Amino acid sequence: MPPVGGKKAKKGILERLNAGEIVIGDGGFVFALEKRGYVKAGPWTPEAAVEHPEAVRQLHREFLRAGSNVMQTFTFYASEDKLENRGNYVLEKISGQEVNEAACDIARQVADEGDALVAGGVSQTPSYLSCKSETEVKKVFLQQLEVFMKKNVDFLIAEYFEHVEEAVWAVETLIASGKPVAATMCIGPEGDLHGVPPGECAVRLVKAGASIIGVNCHFDPTISLKTVKLMKEGLEAARLKAHLMSQPLAYHTPDCNKQGFIDLPEFPFGLEPRVATRWDIQKYAREAYNLGVRYIGGCCGFEPYHIRAIAEELAPERGFLPPASEKHGSWGSGLDMHTKPWVRARARKEYWENLRIASGRPYNPSMSKPDGWGVTKGTAELMQQKEATTEQQLKELFEKQKFKSQ
């Protein structure tokens, strides 16, 4: 069984990683809570921490039970500029400080139910996409950091950055806290959206002060680990050291382009056929470990059973299974209790490792054609606004989409 939390002081994130321990992250909150009816797809903002704290708390608990060592505050897209972007108007009823404080309180409550740490997280901003200055963007991060310091989170994460320039600004802001900082980018092997290679991104993040670097979101485990490998090689070439972190999608994305799954036509409401199985995630966990990654978790699409798969695969190295494994036989071994003999015959590793999974959709293609438009910071269509998107703006986008698909 895992170590139990309590009055005894917990080891910090760097203490764990420096000792060679495996740290298991959590999964994807905005996608999971959108499916449950607590987050709106589009803005993907986390006001549910105030409006539906019980839903956020329960998801944290499920990840903790599945084996997570880190409770990330539900503060993805909780910056002031995002909470009032494109007609969202969250700030008219709830302040950004309330959202961030509530998220910290919930994460701490659940973390203290086990041996988990609390990580306060910031992510990319509408201000950066709209070409605001470094000072203005850092001010947005600082507003969240002030809450994280007040609530005394254990460490900080700058996650989900498409541009290393903004990620560096985030790290430089967070590092002033004196707390350990992790930084992950949502990039693939081609690098960030300004063309900066993964290895150089890693070097810049470490030089800015990050102790843990890697990737999260946008790409599947296979592609994400290719990117982490390039980051690792970049650090080795520069003779820099940092711990490696991976929190990919739980969706298969072999057909995506530089911007990842956001460019796939199935994003966000048709991704279910792409969901990774628990066995896919066990394979990912082993490959990540063999690469030298010691902070292993997930992002969008990752449910608690995916996190449990990581914990189960790495149980020999960690020395224990998570509580959720009490209801899960290794490699389907619990199926030996099934009433049907052909299902009992599936109670073995070889069956699940070698199964070629059908989608049940006979007339559907196995791959899609990404429809990303190649836009990035500074492009007119990426300039953000407080006001809701107008009918005319939508009409222009619909017409452009028709033209692009021809």
Curated annotation (Swiss-Prot):
What is the protein's major site of localization? cytoplasm
Q: In which tissues is it expressed?
A: Found exclusively in liver and kidney.
**PANTHER family, alphabetically?**
BETAINE--HOMOCYSTEINE S-METHYLTRANSFERASE 1
Asked if Cell division is a keyword of the record, the answer is no
Q: What effect is documented for mutating residue 306 to A? A: Has no significant effect on catalytic activity
Cofactor remark from the record? Binds 1 zinc ion per subunit.
The protein's name in its UniProt record: Betaine--homocysteine S-methyltransferase 1
Q: What is its EC number?
A: 2.1.1.5
Subunit structure as annotated in this protein's UniProt entry = Homotetramer.
Q: Does the keyword Transferase apply?
A: yes
Which gene name belongs to this protein? Answer: BHMT
Q: In which pathway does it act?
A: Amine and polyamine degradation; betaine degradation; sarcosine from betaine: step 1/2; Amino-acid biosynthesis; L-methionine biosynthesis via de novo pathway; L-methionine from L-homocysteine (BhmT route): step 1/1
Origin: domain of life: Eukaryota
Q: Which reaction does it catalyse?
A: L-homocysteine + glycine betaine = N,N-dimethylglycine + L-methionine
